[in-house]
Design a protein with these regions (language model features):
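Non-cysteine beta-strand/loop elements that form the S-adenosyl-L-methionine
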Residues: 42-45, 108-118
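Short acidic/His/Gly/Ser-rich catalytic and metal-binding motifs that mark active-site loops
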Residues: 51-53, 119-123
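Distinct, well-ordered alpha-helical segments
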Residues: 94-103
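An N-terminally biased module of ancient metal coordination in phosphate/nucleic-acid-related enzymes
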Residues: 1-93
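Active-site glycine-rich loop that binds ribose-phosphate moieties when present
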Residues: 135-143
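Conserved small/polar residues in nucleotide/adenosyl-binding loops
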Residues: 150-152
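Surface-exposed cleft-lining segments at the edges of enzyme active sites
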Residues: 122-136
Length: 152
């Protein structure tokens, strides 16, 4: 969710820092840029994606360091910019318990439950021309429905 007023971004609820394997921006730099841009509320929602099929991007953050950084910067920016402690947990088949444990492992303000893979296929790089589209759509929406029932 992004909130804007007078064409100025005031709130961003989905951001990733260097704690996510697909980003290299240190949390300190991202927060400084957000603050200098006039952001009032920012949720840091780095990836945790257990079972992700690409070994180059395991998406398993260093949780103690992540939690320490969130706590430090929330205090540092107190009264100037609200920093919400968040997590984007990928939910793959067979990984529900790991996702639940991560979500419950810290006092998060905001959790995004997402899935970047279906049937162990990476959605953003998958070649959809090689599959039956109707079967894939049915699998996709069945999985979305199943996710709504697990109550992370």
């Amino acid at each position: 969710m992004i909130i804007m007023s007078d064409d100025i971004l005031r709130c961003d609820m989905h951001t990733h820092t260097g704690f996510s394997d697909d980003r290299d921006v240190p949390m300190a730099d991202m927060l400084a840029a957000a603050y200098s841009s006039g952001i009032e509320t920012l949720a840091v929602t780095d990836h945790y994606d257990p079972g992700y099929p690409d070994p180059e991007f395991p998406f398993i953050p260093d949780f103690p360091a992540y939690h320490e950084a969130l706590t430090k910067y929330r205090s540092e920016y107190s009264g100037r910019m609200e920093i919400l402690a968040g997590l984007e947990t990928g939910i793959m088949e067979g990984q529900f318990e790991a996702a639940q444990n991560a979500a419950r492992g810290f006092d998060y303000d905001f959790i995004i439950g997402s899935f970047h893979c279906l049937r162990s296929l990476e959605l953003h790089t998958f070649d959809f021309s090689s599959t039956d589209k109707q079967d894939f759509i049915e699998d996709f929406y069945t999985y979305v429905y199943d996710l709504s029932l697990i109550h992370i």
